Amino acid sequence: AGGKATCCPCFMCSYTAGCPWGQCAHHCGCD
């Protein structure tokens, strides 16, 4: 349960390379 603090901004989650730290996608509330 890391929460959204380790998540990248949703607009960066559309491409993995834009998000080298933390997590993306549905885990962070992105889709």
Swiss-Prot record:
Keywords: Disulfide bond, Ion channel impairing toxin, Nematocyst, Neurotoxin, Secreted, Toxin, Voltage-gated sodium channel impairing toxin
This protein's name: Delta-actitoxin-Dar1b
Main localization, broad class: secreted
Note: Da I is found as a major form, whereas Da II is found as a minor form.
Keyword set includes Disulfide bond: yes
Function: Binds specifically to voltage-gated sodium channels (Nav), thereby delaying their inactivation during signal transduction.
Post-translational events: Contains 4 disulfide bonds.
Gene Ontology MF term list: sodium channel inhibitor activity; toxin activity
Family, similarity comment: Belongs to the sea anemone short toxin (type III) family.
GO cellular component, one term: nematocyst
Subcellular location as annotated: Secreted; Nematocyst
The keyword Secreted appears for this protein: yes
Species per Swiss-Prot/TrEMBL record: Dofleinia armata
Annotated InterPro entries: Neurotoxin_3_Actiniidae, Neurotoxin_3_Anemonia
